[in-house]
């Protein structure tokens, strides 16, 4: 019986993705290669995953060429990509950009862009330019950083705020005059990041995708960001699996270290944190929330911020439990710690995320107390 809220077809997808990514991972060798390249992207693997396996369209509606498996489908995929730290633009293109386009684009633009996403024919980097870009005389100026997967994007989708406080969504070619994309090495070498600068870039040089109000746009962003919770669950599961395997093999004082009570307790704490994060992630994707956008927004806030904190704690504990080997470059555990640290701050910090949730439900919060600090 599949765990709530998944059905058998979701578990079939999980097994297919898990098998494919296991081959890609190659026992951790691929992560070392991707990290050494410095761009956090494996083009050949992405083409195979998106096109041959059909995973790019997992959550996109069938009318646009996708599989129509919604939030649950992408939760399954995100969890498995997190387990292997798959270096590809699944989140930026197939989750974040796809959600924005589905929510606010015209029907013609949906048919065009969502079908290209579903077929794996386009990579889109969706950027929030509010507070970062200035818009005067229909010219954009400023810099957005970090810009996830912008280095490899075929389309830069930018949200800006006009004088009427509307959110305007515009798509630009990376070759647009005045637009520059500069890759940089972030804390996480398995995820591609860049700075995208706008120097008098005209709105008319891009394709207007849609327009909406700030509240609707913010909710859409947070619901998309909630998918990162599944990635954190996958990464946390990998850290726990590696730790349990090591504790059952490492011998100290004449016995396996996993037999010591202090080690057992630490592993139990890691498991509890992981399962709590998993529950939050699955609830945020539950069909029970369909039709209630506010509930989806709140569930996504809880999931993303709790799961990212849990992943960070689990990854840190895993390194400590591995002793000296946990600090070596050759052992892949540090990549998971870096992804956990990156996810914790990506888009919004956990502190800001919990404060946003407190404001949403009308609660005066102490975010340090909420986060157990």
Regions found by a protein language model. Name each.
Residues 1-84, 107, 120, 219-373:
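Alpha-helical interface subdomain recognition
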Residues 86-108:
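N-terminal glycine-rich flavin-associated loop
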Residues 97, 120-122, 152-154, 166, ...:
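A generic structural signal for well-ordered coil/turn residues at beta-strand boundaries
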Residues 119-129, 158:
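A short, Trp-centered hydrophobic/proline-enriched beta-strand micro-motif
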Residues 130-141:
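Cytochrome P450 C-terminal beta-domain/meander region
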Residues 143-179:
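A short core secondary-structure module
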Residues 146-147, 173-208:
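Flexible, small-/acidic-enriched active-site or ligand-binding loops
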């Amino acid at each position: 019986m599949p765990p709530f809220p998944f059905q058998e077809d979701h578990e079939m997808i999980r097994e297919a993705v898990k098998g494919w990514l296991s081959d890609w991972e190659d026992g951790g060798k691929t992560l070392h290669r991707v990290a050494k390249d410095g761009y956090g992207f494996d083009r050949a693997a992405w083409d195979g995953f998106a096109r041959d396996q059909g995973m790019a369209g997992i959550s996109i509606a069938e009318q646009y060429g996708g599989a129509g498996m919604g939030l649950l489908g992408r939760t399954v995929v995100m969890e498995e990509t997190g387990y292997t730290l798959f270096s590809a633009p699944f989140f930026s293109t197939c989750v974040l950009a796809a959600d924005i386009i589905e929510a606010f684009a015209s029907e013609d633009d949906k048919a065009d862009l969502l079908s290209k996403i579903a077929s794996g024919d386009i990579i889109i980097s969706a950027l929030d330019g509010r507070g970062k870009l200035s818009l005067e005389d229909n010219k954009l100026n400023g810099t957005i950083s970090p810009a996830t997967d912008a280095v490899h994007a075929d389309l830069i989708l930018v949200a800006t705020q006009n004088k009427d406080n509307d959110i305007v969504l515009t798509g630009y070619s990376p070759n647009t005059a005045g637009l520059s994309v500069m890759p940089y090495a972030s804390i996480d070498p398995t995820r591609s990041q860049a700075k995208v600068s706008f120097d008098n870039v005209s709105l008319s040089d891009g394709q207007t995708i849609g327009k909406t109000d700030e509240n609707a746009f913010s909710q859409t962003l947070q619901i998309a960001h909630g998918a990162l919770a599944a990635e954190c669950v996958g990464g946390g599961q990998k850290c726990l699996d590696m730790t349990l395997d090591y504790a059952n093999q490492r011998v100290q004082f004449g016995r396996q270290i996993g037999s010591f009570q202090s080690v057992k307790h630490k592993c139990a704490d890691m498991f509890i944190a992981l399962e709590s994060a998993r529950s939050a992630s699955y609830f945020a994707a539950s069909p029970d929330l369909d039709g209630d956008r506010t509930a989806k927004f709140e569930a996504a806030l809880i999931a993303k911020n709790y799961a990212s904190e849990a992943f960070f704690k689990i990854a840190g504990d895993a390194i400590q439990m591995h002793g000296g080997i946990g600090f070596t470059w050759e052992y892949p555990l540090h990549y998971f710690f870096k992804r956990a640290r990156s996810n914790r701050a990506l888009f919004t910090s956990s502190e800001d995320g919990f404060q946003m949730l407190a404001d949403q439900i009308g609660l005066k919060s102490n975010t340090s107390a909420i986060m157990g600090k």
